[in-house]
Design a protein with these regions (language model features):
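Catalytic domains that recognize anionic headgroups
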Residues: 1-373
């Protein structure tokens, strides 16, 4: 029944780092309003790949967007969240920095906002109002991309430093200051989006989801100026924060999840069943009840960089498998493996490959199976 289905406002805080959420007073206020999941593995730590995985519930090999240069490759036979919602009575809209980064399937309204010239603090609330009005009582889905972190990264980093310029990597302290400043802007923006829901009087039937597609490096890894070159925690560990009338408040989970879990979760929250088999699993019950959220046994991530020592924009060549404690990274082009104990070495500094840990062979076998599926 359409009248019982919630509105969904899906807000991408593009490039946000899990470990810097605390520096925004506004975002910390929002955290108290809902449930934060802060250990969700990005399937591809760059926007094109990441959002297609999120909105299809399928990895890149299956959905067709498995490389930087395959942005338009979404397969027609793959379920696409806005289209599924539209077919089930939703009015849908989106506001992106570039309309070409995502398939038009299933969207009633598509807006493109110039990241250098337009104020998203104004434009996005206006789009929510327009969507609500044009929905005419139907439930609505709005996907918003807050791109300020991306804008600053491109302007202050990519346009100033080549990937092998040591000046950038030797300036991590200032890089972090730059990042923190723009993330505070993201927190202010997020609060404005929360406020517009209250202003419209729709908070009783609206689920707000603030999330990131990937993190942003500040020079931790030589060869990665921002994201997409490797699969370390600063770029693949992401968060999703759910706020809604039935969502638990002031709740947090560090359980290991995957980006492929988001698609079935949103459909569950909207009470829309799908018959197609999904690699992910819904955690909607955890969001709305006292049930425990179990760790995924393993999660997977992959990338192929535009720049850097292992550039491969056509197809992924860096892969990783992650458990609740360990991560194994495979650099395919140079046939190099790196194993990290995330509990004792959260910054992934010491490669413990070859220390005869039983988990090493299990992770290697599972990762190769996933790559060659």
């Amino acid at each position: 029944m359409n009248e019982l289905r919630p509105n969904i406002i899906f807000v991408l805080l593009d490039g946000s780092r899990v470990d810097r959420l605390r520096i925004s007073a506004e975002f910390n206020e929002l955290i108290k309003d809902g449930t934060l999941l802060d250990n969700v593995t990005s399937a591809m730590p760059y926007t094109f790949g990441a959002i297609n995985v999120i909105l299809t519930g399928q990895y890149g090999k299956e959905n067709g967007v498995d490389g930087y240069y395959k942005v338009a490759g979404l397969k027609n036979n793959i379920l696409f969240l806005p289209e599924v919602l539209q077919q089930n009575g939703y009015f849908t809209s989106r506001g992106l920095l570039n309309d070409k980064i995502l398939s038009p399937r299933g969207f009633d309204i598509r807006k493109e906002f110039n990241e250098y010239e337009e104020d998203l603090n104004t434009k996005h609330p206006e789009l929510i109002k327009e969507t609500y009005k044009k929905a005419k009582g139907k439930p609505f889905f709005t996907f918003l991309q807050f791109s300020r972190i991306h804008t600053v990264t491109v302007t202050d980093v990519l346009k100033k430093f080549e990937w092998d310029d040591k000046k950038f990597y030797n300036n991590k302290k200032n890089n972090l200051k730059t990042y923190d400043k723009v993330f505070r802007e993201a927190g202010i923006y997020a609060k404005k989006i929360r406020n517009i829901v209250d202003e419209l009087g729709i908070s009783d039937n609206t689920i707000l989801i603030f999330f990131t597609d990937h993190g942003t490096g500040i020079g931790e890894r030589f060869g990665e100026r921002n994201y997409g070159s490797f699969t370390y925690e600063e770029t693949i560990r992401t968060f999703y924060h759910f706020i809604g009338p039935k969502i638990k408040k002031n709740s947090k989970s560090e359980s290991l999840l995957s980006a492929v879990d988001i698609f079935p979760t949103i459909l569950d929250l909207c009470r829309i069943p799908v018959k197609e088999k999904q690699p992910g699993k819904s955690f909607a019950e955890f969001l709305t009840s006292a049930t425990k959220l179990e760790n995924n046994k393993f999660t997977f991530s992959e990338t192929g960089a535009l720049h850097g020592p292992y550039s491969s924009p056509e197809i992924s060549n860096v892969f990783c498998i992650k458990s609740s404690r360990y991560k194994l990274i495979f650099l395919k082009d140079v046939d190099e493996w790196r194993l990290f104990d995330l509990m004792n070495d959260p910054k992934e500094v010491e490669n413990i490959l070859g220390n005869e840990l039983p988990i090493e062979n299990e992770l290697r076998k599972k990762l190769l199976q996933w790559i060659n599926r």
